[in-house]
Amino acid sequence: MRLTAIFFMAMQATITAVAQTMNVQTGQVIYSIPSDQAGDMIYTSGTELTILDKTFDISQINKISLDESNVKANTVDVTYNGNSAQVRVPYNLMSYLTVNANNGHVSIIQDDRVTEEITYTLSGSSNDGSFYMDGELKATIVLNGLTLNNPDSAAINIRDGKRIALILTDGTTNTLSDGKNGSQKACLAVKGHTEIDGNGTLNITGNTAHAFWGKEYLQLKKGAGTFNILGAVGDGINVNQYYQQNGGIVNITGVGDDGIQVSFKTDDNDQTIPLSEDEDNTGEVLIKGGTLTATVTAAAAKALKAEGPVTINEEKATTLITLKATGGVTVSGTDISGSAALKSDSQILIDAGTLTLTATGQGGRAINSDGAITINGGKLTARAEGSNYGSSGRGGGGWGPGGGGWGGGSSTSVHKYAKGVKADGIITINGGDMNIYSANHEGLESKTEILISGGTVYVKASDDAVNCSVGDSNTATGNLTISGGTVYAYSTSNDGLDANGNMYVKGGVAIAFGGSGAETGIDIDERHAMTITGGQIFGIGGRVDGSFSGCTQSYGYSSSSTRCSSNSGYFVLSQGSTRLFAVKVPTSFSGVVLVSSPSMQKGTSYSIASYTSVSGTETNGFIASPTVSGNASNSVSITGR
């Protein structure tokens, strides 16, 4: 004992004289104390050594060494090596952290006396390791070339409920995976709110549930690197409060449920916490920059799903979003759910960005909103390529687009239609460039109203290309208003533009190609009317449907027995040798025509003919004041009304 006391006195004298760092190792934990911070070391009863309020049991000390390493306050280093891990704790945290390291598994509990943010740097590799941290103050987790697999539970589990900054060291690749059949919520689980930054790469695989889970919000900073979800039994990313992406690259594939799911945070009784108590609890997706790519394959899965609103813009950086859902439907009695590339239980706002959204599963939708959809800008491609799902309670027949529903007098009990863009609320388009396609049902549909004042909107669908409908077929309403922009609506077997309420054209361009027979280019319900006060209109289909009321701009249409046809090229509206406009023909087409233009006059004769050679500035299939060459074919005369 006397020799031990002499040793510690000599050690203290040495580090003070030489300005070195003393490292006290107990098991897999090393406590580093610079000479200028050591102060008095108190040796008590031959069994304890106290340094800076940290008391060591001498029997538990494996080694004390001196070196010239620099010690950074408030920074803990965890280095994994095979089935082991070494934890280095700085002098100022020795009495504030409870550290346990068992082989490759590390647990650190912060004392509630901690007043400054602690940084934990994780590096190295382990096939049987984990990191657990809990505390009551915000913290930073730095991943510096970490490969970590926990065969039993989460690879990283942060129970600290405050802000957690997750830093991906520039240029590093970090890979996390967890075990199968566990009870963990995710491979990487964070109780607090997570903010990801740093230009590194993070790969996560969730073998029990989600890949990433956050009880509170997840935010990717503008300088964030690459975040790859390589697989998950559940969701790729599952968070509460909100998801915000200001930059970085997020790739999600191989998941068993949704790509990203954002929910409202709930209390211990599973009740949603109101905004008055938690201003962050919006259930919202905010994408202000960066790249997001997600593919989901499960039945009824959504590539991006929010219980709250979805807002997409380029406020922070260029935004590129590619979402794909390939799964079919899930059915429970009369409750049916389909897949979607983008789904909001609230509303969707798109101000900017390039979005490519695809649904290929049965009954799938590219965009599905329980509320409104507003598009002010950006470039949107939305495709529903799957078939419709339907079953009937009795009778024969089956669903067919454009056929008005179920054949054989059957009653529909369960169905899900594959649609390009669908909203229960109002669809408002003020700008942007849209290309929407539906292989087997409506392209752009609102269950309330559609308002278009700008942008270019191209829609191709087997059923109605653009449809507004509120209520059942006997009492349906739903107004469609076009006051600007260029709308090109092409239905292969039903109506191009279909308003079950009133249709108002006040400006812009409205082009509509409809099916044959009873289908029309522009369809107005017989109980309502079309009002034309401006704009350029071209509609062609099996007939001209509906009535006209309150029109202040001249219009005209051909009779049911007078048809305009074209194998290719353009339909051109002319008054003598003056060409008013030209409309590109999507395919070989023949039908009854409805036209209107500010240049038309009541009682004046006009012609519509097919030309193969037309020049001029073309926008979404429309050319104003075109130049034509060659001979006209299939000319039809109409009179302005």
Q: Model-found features: residue ranges?
A:
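Sec/Tat signal peptide C-region and signal peptidase I cleavage site
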Residues: T14-A19
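Compositionally biased alpha-helical segments
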Residues: Q20-N70
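A composition-driven surface/loop motif
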Residues: D67-R641
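Generic alpha-helical secondary structure signal
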Residues: M11-Q12, T47, S84, S610
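Sec-dependent N-terminal signal peptides
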Residues: L3-A13
